[in-house]
Amino acid sequence: MSRYSILIDVNKCNGCYNCFLSCRDEYYGNDYPSYSAAQPLHGQFWMQVHEIERGVYPKPKVSYIPKPCMHCESAPCMDAAKDGAVYRRDDGIVMIDPEKAKGQQAIVNACPYRVIYWNEEKEIPQKCTLCAHRLDEGEKEPRCVESCPVNALVFGDLDDPESEIARLSKSLETESLRPEFNTDSLVQYVGIPKHFVAGEVVYKGDEGECAPGVKVSLTGGGLNLETVTDLFGDFEFEGLDKNETYKLVVSAEGFAENTQEFTTFKDVNLGEIVLDPK
């Protein structure tokens, strides 16, 4: 028995929207009997791409989070459905029967991820099917995965130890998008944005000369990290937990250590950190 899933690496996603566009191309105006009815022209995003703005000037960032149906093993939509209108295939894919689901708007309301949509014209709920019709025809992956130019989406069988997705799931730190929902989602993520701290180091005097190659260490929240400033004296630490207090130490030979403490109520820009000669 298989458990098909997608592993989404947020670190790789560049927001090209190929996944969204290829999904629309596959489903808009196209019926796949027993699998799905055609998407309407407006209002449905079976593969959403969320743009997350992070940080503050002059250290802003943008992250992109692709978001399909999570194909949950404890799917609230299945509990809300009547007459078997939502079911799980033997390969783990959660499907909505377009005929049995007619009139069942409760299926839409049951999804905590908000990835099930109501087709007003046809009066049915609709969502991502992981291109089950393609898989059953012998294709190896959904359209969204096939069209990703940076390999941010990896599809495969989680129960096949030889599959790429199984190997990556073991070697990387994967997580659910919203673990507090307790839905045991098959779709997993790498690199969901947390908080980050950034700053720039300069030497006192010399008109604020950049300080490249300077050691910067960070402790707190169970972390003990170290980096060096780049050619412009900039540094950054990613993956910091919310509402944690951290200590940052900047040290360079011949200069006094500079210590900063901060709490991650949000992303932090420490600005210019000046190193004084000893």
Region annotations inferred by a language model:
Residues N18-S36, S74-K100, A106-E123, K140-P161:
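Iron-sulfur cluster-binding cysteine motifs and their immediate structural context
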Residues C144-F196:
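Long, compositionally biased charged/polar accessory segments in the mid-to-C-terminal portions
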Residues L186-V187, F262-K278:
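Extracellular beta-sheet/turn segments enriched in Thr/Pro/Gly and aliphatic residues
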Residues H195-V197, K204-G221:
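Short, ordered, surface-exposed loop/turn motifs in non-cytosolic proteins
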Residues V197-K204, G233, I273:
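A short, amphipathic beta-strand motif
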Residues A211, E236-K247, E253:
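Short Pro-Gly-centered beta-turn/loop motif in secreted/extracellular proteins
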Residues G221-E236:
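Short, acidic Ser/Thr/Gly-rich low-complexity loop/linker segments typical of extracellular
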Residues V249-E261:
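A short, solvent-exposed loop/turn motif at the edges and junctions
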